[in-house]
A protein has these predicted regions:
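Conserved beta-strand positions in the central sheet of alpha/beta enzyme cores
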Residues: 40-41, 69, 92, 170, ...
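Glycine-rich beta-to-alpha transition loops that act as phosphate-gripper elements at the mouths
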Residues: 20-24, 70-77, 94-96, 147-152, ...
């Protein structure tokens, strides 16, 4: 079974928590898994990650229980084929607008006769040719998650969900906010209404649906709407928030570092211990 499908099945009514991976650091990815995140999205759309970096991040996630999903740069056959050959088992395919584009996305993830994925005998995806009957079994273990990011796409939700081979839908609140005229304001009532409506409709047709929120409070809201799995921020976002909080807590309004007493002496940012 596909790892994401298995995770969602075992989670029941509890929405698994994930995060976004944007840093090209296997150590950070592995740390996120050990921190307790149950799934992650390795993002090739909005980062400069190359294929070898993606492989290293997949290997790092593989050292944990965290299920990796790779977001490809675009809904095109070549990108999808290369990422699958690199060993990804679940793909997030961005900006799917209708059933035709959904069919094209799914076809790119499947070998003939179910799809058009090109066959390579020696790839990381097939464990370098050691997986028995990989060309036949891969179609059952690959997962396709399609991202809806505009009101036009959400209007086609049921038609997209009905395409055979679609494992899950994923709402992109950032691009959705821009498409609704509220760029960057994902908490705007117009955006939240569309998000809630999309979650309700996915639940009605039995289609798992995920999304991403920037704060714990937003994640709780999305879970209450009916989203089956939700990510919070990203590795870089979590790093920046922690770093900024530390700097704010230890810096005076005039920009000087607070003075601390250490072993009977004082220490400032300009001195040495």
């Amino acid at each position: 079974m596909n790892p994401l499908r298995q995770l969602l099945k075992s989670a029941g009514s509890h929405a698994p928590l994930g995060t976004w991976i944007m840093a090209a650091s296997p150590l950070v990815t592995e740390a996120m898994g050990h921190a307790g995140f149950q799934w992650c999205v390795i993002d090739m759309e909005h980062t400069p990650l190359d294929m070898m970096e993606v492989i290293h991040l997949l290997q790092a996630a593989g050292n944990t229980k965290m299920v990796p999903i790779v977001r490809v740069p675009w809904n095109d056959t070549v990108s999808i084929k290369r990422v699958l050959d690199a060993g990804a088992q679940t793909l997030l395919i961005p900006f799917v607008q209708n059933a035709d584009e959904a069919q094209r996305a799914v076809a790119a993830t499947r070998y003939p006769p179910e799809g058009i994925r090109g066959l390579a005998g020696m790839s990381r995806g097939s464990k370098f040719g050691t997986v028995p009957d990989y060309a036949r079994t891969a179609n059952k273990t690959v997962g396709a998650v399609l991202q809806l990011e505009t009101p036009a796409a959400v209007a086609q939700l049921e038609a997209i969900a009905a395409v055979p081979g679609v494992d899950s839908l994923f709402l992109g609140p950032g691009d959705l906010s821009a498409a609704l005229g509220h760029a960057g304001n994902t908490g705007h009532p117009d955006v939240m209404r569309v998000m809630a409506d999309a979650a309700r409709r996915c639940n009605a047709v039995g289609m798992p649906v995920g999304t991403v929120g920037g704060t714990p409070e937003v994640v709780v809201q999305y879970r209450a709407m009916g989203f089956n799995y939700v990510a919070i921020g990203s590795d870089l976002g979590l790093l920046m928030r922690g770093a900024q909080a530390a700097v704010k807590a230890l810096t005076t309004p005039d920009g000087e570092t607070h003075v601390h007493t250490l072993s009977g002496g004082t220490q400032t940012s300009s001195g040495a211990y």
